[in-house]
C-alpha cells in the first residue's frame, strides 16, 4: 500500500532526513511526513552552522563526539554534496572573571567525558585568531570542533535518501498518532492515514503536540533566534566562534561572507504570532556584540537577516527516547 512503510518519520528537517538516509542504507522502507511545504524549513535551514562538541551538556557529548569522529569527515563525499565542513576548532570567548568561570565549568565537565578542550589566555587566543580584540582575556579552545553549511547538508541527506527510495511527502501535517488494539500503528493527517511498524517523531517543537495525542508529555519550549549574513570579505579566519554568555556565534564561510547568530534577550517577552519573524532590535544587538570582539568587522555590510525557532527541552539537553511500553511499542 502507498501509505504503509516499515518506518514513518514525522519531520523533514536535518534530523528526519538523516534518519531516513541511514535507515534506507540498511534497506528499510521509509516514509517522511513534513507538515510544511518544503523540507528543512525550520531550524535546520536557519541556524549558524556550528558543528561543535564544546559548550554542551556532558550527557550529549558521547553521541556528538561519535558524529565528529565517524560521520562528518566523510559526509560530503558520502552524500555527493559539498557540506562545506571545516574542522578548524571552536573558540568560546571571555572578557572577565565571570566569563572565565563559565568557560572553566564547561571545560572541566567536558574533559571528564574525554573531550579535547582546554582553557587558553588572551595571548594564545590572538595567536589562533589575530583579529580578536585586546579585550578578550580568555577562551575555551576545542580544536576538533568546526562548522558546516546546514542548507547543503540537509539537502544532501534529502537527495541521497530519495535515491535510496525514501518517500518524502510535504504539506502533510500530522495531527494524531493512533493505536489499534493497544499498539501504535497509524499516523493521521487531515487527508490521509499512514501505517508503519515504527514511528519516529522528529518534528522539533511540533513533536510536543503530536506526542500529546498518545498521552506523552514532552517538557519542551522554543526560543526565537536570529541570524545574519554579510557581504563577502577577504579571508580572515576559519574557526567557529562563540562567547561565554552566548552574545553571538558564527564563522566565515568558504565564500568569504560571515554568518552570525544570536539574540537580544527580549525574545521571550516579544509577541509570538506563530511564525519566526525578525525583530528590529535583534540584529543591532548582535552587531554591537560582534564589534566589541572583532573591531575589523565594523564596516562589514549585512546582506540579509532571518529568524528561526530553537527548540529546547526543559533541561536544555536533546532527548532520544525509545517508548517500549506494551501499549506503545516502536515509538521513538
Outline where the language-model segments fall.
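Short beta-strand to alpha-helix junction loop
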Residues: 63, 93-102, 141-159, 275-281
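Single conserved hydrophobic/aromatic residue that forms the stacking wall/gate
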Residues: 321-332
Amino acid at each position: 500500500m502507498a501509505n504503509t512503510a516499515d518506518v514513518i518519520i514525522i519531520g523533514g528537517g536535518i534530523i528526519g532526513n538523516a534518519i531516513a538516509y541511514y535507515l534506507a542504507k540498511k534497506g528499510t522502507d521509509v516514509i517522511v511526513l513534513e507538515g510544511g511545504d518544503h523540507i528543512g524549513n525550520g531550524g535546520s535551514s536557519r541556524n549558524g552552522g556550528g558543528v561543535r562538541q564544546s559548550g554542551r551538556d556532558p550527557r550529549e557529548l558521547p553521541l556528538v563526539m561519535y558524529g565528529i569522529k565517524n560521520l562528518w569527515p566523510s559526509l560530503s563525499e558520502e552524500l555527493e554534496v559539498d557540506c562545506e565542513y571545516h574542522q578548524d576548532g571552536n573558540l568560546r570567548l571571555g572578557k572577565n572573571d565571570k566569563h572565565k568561570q563559565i568557560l572553566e565549568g564547561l571545560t572541566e565537565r567536558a574533559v571528564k567525558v574525554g573531550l579535547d578542550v582546554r582553557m587558553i589566555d588572551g595571548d594564545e587566543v590572538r595567536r589562533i585568531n589575530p583579529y580578536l580584540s585586546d579585550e578578550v582575556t580568555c577562551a575555551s579552545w576545542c580544536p576538533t570542533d568546526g562548522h558546516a553549511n546546514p542548507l547543503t547538508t540537509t539537502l544532501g541527506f534529502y537527495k541521497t535518501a530519495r535515491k535510496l527510495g525514501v518517500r518524502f511527502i510535504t504539506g502533510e501535517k500530522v495531527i494524531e498518532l493512533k493505536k489499534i488494539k493497544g499498539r501504535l500503528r497509524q499516523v493521521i493527517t487531515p487527508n490521509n492515514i499512514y501505517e508503519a511498524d515504527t514511528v519516529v517523531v522528529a518534528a522539533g517543537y511540533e513533536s510536543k503536540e503530536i506526542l500529546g495525542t498518545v498521552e506523552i508529555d514532552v517538557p519542551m519550549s522554543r526560543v526565537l533566534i536570529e541570524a545574519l549574513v554579510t557581504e563577502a570579505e577577504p579571508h580572515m579566519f576559519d574557526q567557529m566562534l562563540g562567547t561565554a554568555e552566548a552574545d553571538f556565534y558564527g564563522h566565515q564561510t568558504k565564500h568569504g561572507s560571515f554568518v552570525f547568530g544570536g539574540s537580544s534577550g527580549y525574545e521571550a517577552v516579544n509577541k509570538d504570532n506563530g511564525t519566526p519573524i525578525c525583530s528590529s532590535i535583534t540584529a543591532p544587538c548582535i552587531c554591537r556584540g560582534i564589534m566589541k570582539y572583532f573591531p575589523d568587522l565594523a564596516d562589514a555590510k549585512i546582506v540579509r537577516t532571518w529568524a528561526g525557532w530553537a527548540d529546547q527541552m526543559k533541561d536544555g539537553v536533546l532527548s532520544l527516547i525509545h517508548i517500549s511500553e506494551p501499549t506503545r511499542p516502536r515509538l521513538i
